Amino acid sequence: AEADPKNEKTYRANAEKYKEKIRAAVSEADAKLAKIDAPRILVTGHDAFNYFGKHFDLEVHATDFISTEAKRSAKEIDDLATLIASKKIPTIFLDNQANPQAIKSLQEAVHAKGWDVKISDAELYADSLGAEPGVDTYLGAFTHNVDAVAEALAK
């Protein structure tokens, strides 16, 4: 608006419309994710979902943390596998930024503890958008993530 004052009203109106779309998406997400029973635990490949978990009251655990180069120790992975098996978490998630082998290794560790955890078919979008239509916008990726988590964990 400062760079193009003659169109300021249009920019501000568009911003308000977009904010309303965000509020509506969050409200819908609140309703969908509220259906997840305890344990309300989200396991992903990257801790980028901590903000998501905090807002939607989900405990978030990741196989990678801080960055895609920072890996968990073998003990931390074993502890996470124990948590998943003991809480009978049904599904863990790959995301578009993390090492898929870490999630697959975690799944194997959980299986060794006697629990059949699934890896979701729906990849989550962390820290970036997808290239495909539907996940190539903030709202599209957000809605996709909400739907994937709700479908996998709200059973």
Question: Predicted regions: what is each one?
Answer:
Residues 1-155:
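Extracytoplasmic metal-acquisition and chelation regions
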